[in-house]
Amino acid sequence: MPRITRRRTISAPVPEVWGLVSDPYNLPRWWPRTSRVENVDSKGGGRRAEWTKLLETAEGRGVRADFRCVSSAEPERYVWEQELEGTPFERHLRRYGIEVALDDEDGGTRVSIAAQQTLRGLSRLGSPMMRRGQGALLDEALDGIERALT
């Protein structure tokens, strides 16, 4: 699946935005439908950190999903992927990753969030719908960053 990217300039400085987006415990403050984060294991800083997100479904149920940071370059880029093997998500997804990139822009921060989702099997037929859904999710995430820092 192609990469979906959304960008926005946030009025907060890069170090503040970095502090928010690079700490998994902050995800409920800005990432859509995340009610809480558990089991954060920060192995040597941000890179290789692992955590469990409790996601709220539209029906109000909680769904657990495990993630790990695969790349971190302070204060420029934070990348995480969902651990899919052995989970119900594995039936539909081959890969799911998020990259947050930060650039200084006139005292504020240019935030780019990209999602890359590779669908598996018959789920690939829903690709256009998934692209729209991911775009909306990334817009909500940018709204969340703005709310959390302004």
Set out the residue ranges of the language-model regions.
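Short solvent-exposed loop/turn micro-motifs enriched in small/polar/acidic residues
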Residues: 1, 60-62, 93-95
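Beta-strand/loop substructures that line and gate deep hydrophobic ligand-binding cavities in soluble
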Residues: 84-140
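Hydrophobic ligand-binding cavity/cleft-lining segments
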Residues: 1-47
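Short, intrinsically disordered, mixed-charge
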Residues: 19-33, 131, 135, 139, ...
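Hydrophobic/aromatic beta-strand elements that line small-molecule binding cavities or substrate pockets
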Residues: 6-8, 64-71, 94-104
